[in-house]
Amino acid sequence: MNFEKIIEEKVNQKLKELRLKNSLEILEKLDINTELKEALKSTLLKRLNGEKEFYKISIDKKPKAVVAFSGGVDSSTSAIIAKQIFDVKAVSCYSKYIMTDEMRENAKNIAKKIGISLEFVSIDLEEVYKGVVNGKFHPCGRCHKVIENAVIDYAKKIDAEFVIFGDLLAFGYLALYREDEIFRFNLPSFFALTKDEEREILKNNGIELKMSYGCPLLKIYHKHNKGYKFTIQRILREVRGRVVNEEEGFKNIVEILNQQ
């Protein structure tokens, strides 16, 4: 009997329960539509009870929401779950530095499989690119902020009440909160999902994704700077947060170290 594995599983389960109960507490304090609150509460309770399809729920009046969509594991899972609860519009932020033509087509195909409309919004990453090739900074934080702002601006333009991001690590009050007139919803962290659980949801909806770690801009950073410290720290943060297992974390680290 592998006692270490048993203990690890029990710790992971307890941590998941604590995070889900925390999401319930956050939900109760929010001033949102009663029907929506009850729907989200129901999905959280189903998740606490271990139901695989916890997100399958019917709601009469769906609030308008924008999903930040790349076609990756996190955003695709977020879109599948959000579609059950919200009137969803997916937005993909496009720049030649972070999205190839192949990635763009892949995002279109995944959105079609999920059954959501997708719009591409062009973003300006020239200054971020210059900083990356000149070795001034790691791209992820600045790039993520540009994308966030573009998605939120789009949501305001179409009068959406919610903006949904695929953040796995935004625990506690960061999972769902109001920012000015829009609710920001980090959906995977709200439901305490792991990367493996996300893949299972995708598979159950006929989607299997095999993707390399990082976007083209991150690979440019590694090529020009030969510095992997900050990327490895980001990977280890996901492992410590128990949203990615140790094997996948190790695989991702090896992959970036081999990027030339």
Curated annotation (Swiss-Prot):
InterPro entries: ATPase_PP-loop_MJ1638 (IPR012096), DUF7411 (IPR055834), Ni-pincer_cofactor_biosynth (IPR052188), Rossmann-like_a/b/a_fold (IPR014729)
Transmembrane regions: none
Pfam families registered for this protein in UniProt: DUF7411
Domain of life: Archaea
Annotated PANTHER family: ATPASE, PP-LOOP SUPERFAMILY-RELATED, EXSB FAMILY PROTEIN
Name by which UniProt lists this protein: Uncharacterized protein MJ1638
